[in-house]
């Protein structure tokens, strides 16, 4: 793991130890919690991609999203090109 990734993991774990217990009630809508998701994402995908996944997860942790089980993906998703469910726009030859 890179130095940047180790630093980010330490930062999240510090949040888990010192700030999270002071909240009046659990506030995360997902399992694993957003902070645990961040640690796993950074450990699995590195500092940059892991932080991106963690930020996207925190943005989704709101009352408009139902929540539930949302594990860290095994492989970093590729958003280049069309979505797999989008029909191709190629013209017939």
UniProtKB/Swiss-Prot annotation:
The keyword rRNA-binding does not apply. GO terms for cellular component: plasma membrane. Keywords: Cell membrane, Membrane. The keyword rRNA-binding does not apply. InterPro entries: Membr_insert_effic_factor_YidD. Residues 72-93 are annotated as: Disordered. Residues 82-93 have a biased composition (Basic residues). It is found in: Cell membrane. Its main location: membrane. It comes from the Bacteria. It is a peripheral membrane protein. Belongs to the UPF0161 family. Could be involved in insertion of integral membrane proteins into the membrane. This is Putative membrane protein insertion efficiency factor. It comes from Deinococcus geothermalis (strain DSM 11300 / CIP 105573 / AG-3a).
